[in-house]
Amino acid sequence: MEVFPLLLFLSFCWSRTWDLATADSIIHIGAIFDESAKKDDEVFRTAVGDLNQNEEILQTEKITFSVTFVDGNNPFQAVQEACELMNQGILALVSSIGCTSAGSLQSLADAMHIPHLFIQRSTAGTPRSGCGLTRSNRNDDYTLSVRPPVYLNEVILRVVTEYAWQKFIIFYDSEYDIRGIQEFLDKVSQQGMDVALQKVENNINKMITTLFDTMRIEELNRYRDTLRRAILVMNPATAKSFISEVVETNLVAFDCHWIIINEEINDVDVQELVRRSIGRLTIIRQTFPVPQNISQRCFRGNHRISSSLCDPKDPFAQNMEISNLYIYDTVLLLANAFHKKLEDRKWHSMASLSCIRKNSKPWQGGRSMLETIKKGGVNGLTGDLEFGENGGNPNVHFEILGTNYGEELGRGVRKLGCWNPVTGLNGSLTDKKLENNMRGVVLRVVTVLEEPFVMVSENVLGKPKKYQGFSIDVLDALSNYLGFNYEIYVAPDHKYGSPQEDGTWNGLVGELVFKRADIGISALTITPDRENVVDFTTRYMDYSVGVLLRRAEKTVDMFACLAPFDLSLWACIAGTVLLVGLLVYLLNWLNPPRLQMGSMTSTTLYNSMWFVYGSFVQQGGEVPYTTLATRMMMGAWWLFALIVISSYTANLAAFLTITRIESSIQSLQDLSKQTDIPYGTVLDSAVYQHVRMKGLNPFERDSMYSQMWRMINRSNGSENNVLESQAGIQKVKYGNYAFVWDAAVLEYVAINDPDCSFYTVGNTVADRGYGIALQHGSPYRDVFSQRILELQQSGDMDILKHKWWPKNGQCDLYSSVDAKQKGGALDIKSLAGVFCILAAGIVLSCLIAVLETWWSRRKGSRVPSKEDDKEIDLEHLHRRVNSLCTDDDSPHKQFSTSSIDLTPLDIDTLPTRQALEQISDFRNTHITTTTFIPEQIQTLSRTLSAKAASGFAFGSVPEHRTGPFRHRAPNGGFFRSPIKTMSSIPYQPTPTLGLNLGNDPDRGTSI
């Protein structure tokens, strides 16, 4: 490894003390200590002296050493000093410094192959945080951690869980790295605990004074409530000062409970902390095994330890730090490793190593020495010191000390339990119960949310949750009579409790078994299995099993008229209408029908579509079709429409008419016999265990339970069962499911459902009951049972029941059909979609009418003015036409005036070329007239053109004009002809072919 050349320019301004080895010594070790750890240096020298005097370990060889002091948080200085030690030649490096410098020494030791024994040291007795040294999976990791890993997260989490704290505050001093308990904070947050953090400054008095100056009375009271549960992560000196300040300023009361955790707390610190505190105090510290025989306390095998280190009465031993003990055991471990190497004659001489040279080689004997140290082990002041595969010391033990609640200062302290990574907590942290007088007793109550037994009534941020319900009313009645107070919390797993495979219990019962709660109350049934592990009061309410089902109800859909057909079928029908209409149009276009004279019909695409749609809705059509192909097409279409309309009508009646058949499930027996509706219960609940026990019992006569168990146990219970009762209720409400559960709970749900969509069936025989669970051997069982009997005899219990289960509820519990739907008439909601379709058609037709009116007015505005109108003497025209159309001997025959019948005519609406029979043409004269000629002479209209052509000589046509016509009234006046309908007829002047057809005043205006 190449070290930066910058190290060459570092000044040697740090004080160092060297104890040089004698020229013939082959055992030389180096030590680097924090400059504030003077006691580490003293213990190190004492350990070397004790071992040099022990001729059984090192017979002829003596240990020499070199010690240097550095700033624990200066990695450059630590590397510089380590290089100086390696340059002298050392077999191993011992360091007692901070984590920052330890990482640099780890890299240097790995490069030089020097065994490095690291003792983590905290600043001024503050609790340690994990160093997080990088461990390589290869064999080139030469750093061994003498002190065990930091287990503060695991220990404090176990203790807080044992005490069942839900809200507390953590105080830590300014020297502590709060990241050390990050894992603990994450886990308690996942469990829903309310945790606050506050840093304690060095000037504690000033900090407390600032709190009183800045907080209002309400805020200060809330802060006092927070201090009832607190954890102190700080050095012993700061903890003593902090406790004294908060006690003197009355920030804490006698009901407070504080936990102090620190590996460095000694016996003197424990006595002082207990003396200054009030309320309950729990102390967590690291402990080491001590021989029971006093005379053997200073002996570890064949080695004798100096009395100043092992005698509890010695002042030096009383004030020793944890790192001092591990320093001594480290030297003892190295001495035994050296002895092992000498015995095996596998000794590797020391080598002078240079960190600065680029081509410097590591020590060849480093790997062999490291393996000897790792495989060895000693029993010293800290107990067994050995290393695992990861290079760490796994042996650690914590001691949990505590006091009981009390008002007087200076209470006694006792050992509550111990903790280690292998077995966990050993012991009970529950304090002793007070006397039978329950005045002032605070009980911890665990519950499970279950309507209407226990429900959350108020959940305000920053305040404890408030609960209500039937069980809470019973608990309040007991509390008011007996005088105790209680703190309530919800079971972490929200379960009532059932035995596990390892013999433990979970849920509410598990909280009582592990003594984390004093009382358990909810919809908790009394069962034989539960009575084996906890105590129950007398039942305060009867219990029976019920079934929750959903009523048969009508589905309201405003577009129910569309329900008989699927959306895809509607789309196919619409496409079929368009397709058939198009085919009808094409067939008539390819083979047009021959219509009778005078018919005004037209087979356009629009008319074809309209005809197809009209026939589909059975309203007929206006366009007659005479071709064989078209008629075959329409015949098939009419048959299709008949079947579709008939199917729609029948299916619509089925959809709009509700079949109100009473449910066949009226009991548990009915439920077990059917398989259409799946059913289940809460997994591992009392109902689940009851059905399982009955269903698997070969001597059970009733087959109902075996049938129910087969349904409930599908897929090992995961298919039809739920984890919570609320999930089962929701499953019934929104699916095809029946929920088997406590009848009292189901009745409350059915009564208070806003939609009245539930009904219940079940067994009315109460073979069990609900009770209050207590710890096994609790002194409160009898007094609770007695008070419950008094409430039942006085009728107060019935009053509480009627509060939550009223007799006259808004819903019927036992009817499987909604009473509101028993009528036979359809309501407006069922056919609202039809009205919507009609309204849409009306609105659309009105819009089209407005557009047509606008278009007609716009088109009419283009008609020429009255000044440009030309008048025509239609009577003169009639005479001339009559003269042309009659025989030669009757040249003066005229039409009867009464035969002239002029009707309004819109040129735009004239038929197409296919109806030419309806129009009389004067082809050569460019005069076109409509069929206002009487019917009896219509046949003459076709010869009119030829006669005119032969009887007149055409001259040049000077111009082509258009204009409306007028004719004379019988009284000789003029009036506008009915043909004057905002349209024009083209005409040209008739040329003179030998006849004088000029303008004649008597004949009126000519065309």
UniProtKB/Swiss-Prot annotation:
Annotated signal peptide: 1-23
Chief location bin: membrane
UniProt name for this protein: Glutamate receptor ionotropic, delta-2
Subcellular location: Postsynaptic cell membrane
UniProt disease link: Defects in Grid2 are the cause of the Lurcher phenotype. Heterozygous animals display a characteristic swaying of the hind quarters and jerky up and down movements following cerebellar Purkinje cell degeneration during postnatal development. Homozygous animals die shortly after birth because of a massive loss of midbrain and hindbrain neurons during late embryogenesis.
Keyword GTP-binding on entry: no
Positions occupied by motif PDZ-binding: 1005-1007
Annotated positions binding Ca(2+) 1: E531, V534, D535
UniProt: Ca(2+) 2 binding residues: D753, D755, S757
Cytoplasmic side: 588-635, 852-1007
Modification Phosphoserine occurs at: S883, S890, S1006
Gene that encodes the chain: Grid2
Tissue: Expressed selectively in cerebellar Purkinje cells where it is localized in dendritic spines.
Subunit structure: Tetramer; dimer of dimers. Interacts with EML2, MAGI2 (via PDZ domains) and AP4M1. Interacts with BECN1, GOPC, GRID2IP, SHANK1 and SHANK2. Interacts with CBLN2, but not with CBLN4. Interacts with CBLN1 (via C1q domain); the interaction is CBLN1-NRX1 complex formation-dependent; CBLN1-binding is calcium-independent; CBLN1 hexamers anchor GRID2 N-terminal domain dimers to monomeric NRXN1 isoform beta; promotes synaptogenesis and mediates the D-Serine-dependent long term depression signals and AMPA receptor endocytosis.
Positions of the UniProt region annotated as Interaction with AP4M1: 921-991
Parts of the chain that traverse the membrane: 567-587, 636-656, 831-851
Ranges per topology, Extracellular: 24-566, 657-830
Site feature location: Essential for dimerization: F76
